[in-house]
Amino acid sequence: VVVGIHLKKNCKLPSGENVQNIIEKFQCNSWIGLVFACVSPEIVERTSDFFSDLKLPFGFKVNLWGIEEPTPVQTFNSAKYNEIGTNPNIALGSRNLSAKEFYKFTKRMVEKGARILGGCCETKPEHIKEISTLK
C-alpha cells in the first residue's frame, strides 16, 4: 500500500495531526511508501529534512497552484448542488514553473531521499516527462 497524505505549511495534516503520529498509529507491513499529495513545492522543501529520516520510501505529488497553501474548497466554492462553482484555476491561480525548473526542484528532493515522484494540480505532461529522466 502506498499511503497518500496532504500536508499544510506547518508539516501537519489538515486535521492537525502530525505525520509521525499517523505512521506510528497506522503503519503495517503492507505499507510500501508514503506520498505527500497535492502540496506546494515550498511545503515539500520545508518538510523534506523531516521525511528523509523515515524508514519508509517517500515522495510527493507537487501542485503548481499560484499560492503556497490553498484554503479549503468551501471558502471559495459556494455553489449549490445545481450551480457551477468557482474554477480553481481562477481562484488559486497557476505558477509559471518550467519543466526545467520542476526538474531542478525534483532533483534536489531526490538528493534528500525522495523516491516517489510526481505532479498534481497544474503540472503538465512536460513536467512529468522532464523528471522521468531522473535516476
Which residues does each PLM region occupy?
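Domain-level signal for soluble alpha/beta catalytic cores
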Residues: 1-135
